[in-house]
Design a protein with these regions (language model features):
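C-terminal structured subdomain/cap of oxidoreductase catalytic cores
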Residues: 1-5, 9, 42-45, 83-144, ...
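Mid-to-C-terminal "cap/lid" subdomains and adjacent gly/pro-rich loops that border
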Residues: 1-77, 136, 140, 157-160, ...
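Extracytoplasmic/periplasmic, Sec-exported soluble proteins
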Residues: 121, 154-157
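Short, glycine/acidic-rich hinge or "gate" loops at secondary-structure transitions
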Residues: 143-155
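Low-complexity, glycine/alanine/valine/leucine- and proline-rich hydrophobic stretches
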Residues: 71-89
Length: 238
């Protein structure tokens, strides 16, 4: 970016700490504002019935480029300038991962295999989202801010190069669902009352019971699930 971005100074840990302290004490300053202030729900292509992409805009350089340590030189390879950018989230991925027991030890961490981007539809959708985001950031409204594209860089143009960049950099946004999915089949963990099959007196009430992802953030649906579960339990107790 040619002009300062609001979050540039907060990449220094001491300044970030002061911003949080100011927010706690005075309810003012950058620490009071969630950085992802702009976003949208979009269709990756015209034939999609309803939005399958969510994008976020952030007024700063992403943390993956590094944190600036106070009073030290910026490490090699870390972007040390103003910037802004965006992220693309696929709302309804077809790829399915798995969680397996590592051993009979109940304290052993499970084996988690996310299996991201394992279907052609997922790769096509993310590629379309990448192109949409790049097009948005190249609009005339950004002209006075535009410097140069730092990530991934203007050399990434072909579909194969875009796919390779996405595969190397894609990550979770921590909205997983479905590990204890609700359903009527034998592979479902809970029934329609969210009771765990084969276990007496146990229910699950969180995002893990969703059979598929909703086309939005998962926090509001999870609150709804909890409220519904409370109603079912109270009705049963009455």
């Amino acid at each position: 970016s040619k002009e300062p971005d609001r979050l540039f100074g907060l990449r220094r840990m001491d300044r970030a700490a002061l911003a949080v302290l100011r927010a706690m004490l005075t309810k003012t300053g950058d620490g009071t504002v969630f950085p992802l202030e702009g976003g949208a729900f979009l269709k990756s292509r015209a034939e999609v019935e309803y939005p399958d992409l969510q994008i976020h805009f952030y007024p700063g350089v992403p943390a993956t480029t590094g944190v600036r340590v106070p009073f030290q030189k910026t490490p090699p390879g870390v972007h040390d300038g103003y910037g802004y950018g965006g992220t693309i989230c696929q709302l309804r991925p077809e790829s399915r991962g798995e969680i397996r027991l590592r051993s009979a030890d109940p304290f052993a961490s499970p084996v988690i295999r996310a299996n991201y981007l394992s279907t052609e539809t997922d790769r096509l959708t993310m590629r379309a989202g990448f192109k949409i985001m790049r097009d948005i950031l190249q609009q005339q409204a950004f002209a006075k801010f535009n410097g140069h594209e730092y990530m991934p860089g203007p050399q990434v143009q072909s579909d194969s190069d875009i796919d390779a960049y996405i595969a190397a950099n894609a990550n979770t946004v921590y909205h997983p669902v479905g590990t204890c999915r609700m359903g009527m089949d034998e592979q479902s963990v809970v029934d329609g009352q969210l009771r765990v099959r084969g276990v007496e007196g146990l229910r699950i009430s969180d995002a893990s019971i969703m059979p598929t992802l909703v086309s939005a953030n998962t926090n509001a649906p999870t609150i709804m699930i909890a409220e519904k579960t409370a109603d079912m339990i109270l009705r049963g107790a009455a």
